[in-house]
Amino acid sequence: MESIDAVLYINLEHRKDRNEHILHEIHKITHKNIHRIDAVKRDNGVLGCGLSHIKALEYALEHEWKTVLILEDDFTFKSISIDDHIELLFNYDFDVGLLSHNVLRYSDTDNDFVKRVIYSQTTSSYIIKRDYIPVLLQNMRKAMKDMEKNGRRTENCIDIHWVPLMLKDKWYASYPEIGYQYGNHSDIEQGFREYGC
């Protein structure tokens, strides 16, 4: 996977099962430049999730990488031509490229397998260009500041709060999605979840 400089995956220290799972998935596309981001644990799991993505983006900025893939540790690739579908995204000048999506609304491109994103939820897998990291960081920090002040609300969850960026910037998605979150125990929701996306 030559187009991606590094893969960062978010994982809570005690979730050894998920660590093993996500490394297996990442090794389907690369065996180099893989970095574990120690997830932030909070009683409010959604807050911890948002802070963990901020931590991953900050880590990416500390390095000279131009393009980074960020994965949550329950992400699972579908058995399709993974590399080919990821490479298709790089035919477009994107800020963020989504590998998975939920409630996707889009406009067509000149390729049936790539869509211009208008709306999507889930932060389970995305490729981000270095120049865009400060923009997404600012958006996520604002969401987490609101969550710390006002508690969890739909509009301050990071995968909702980032939607306005999709309307004004260059967000693209693999279509159909090339991965999903596998069903397992969620530390965020404190129970079994199978999102199907």
Region spans (language model):
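An acidic/histidine-cluster motif and surrounding catalytic segment
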Residues: M1-L71, F75-C197
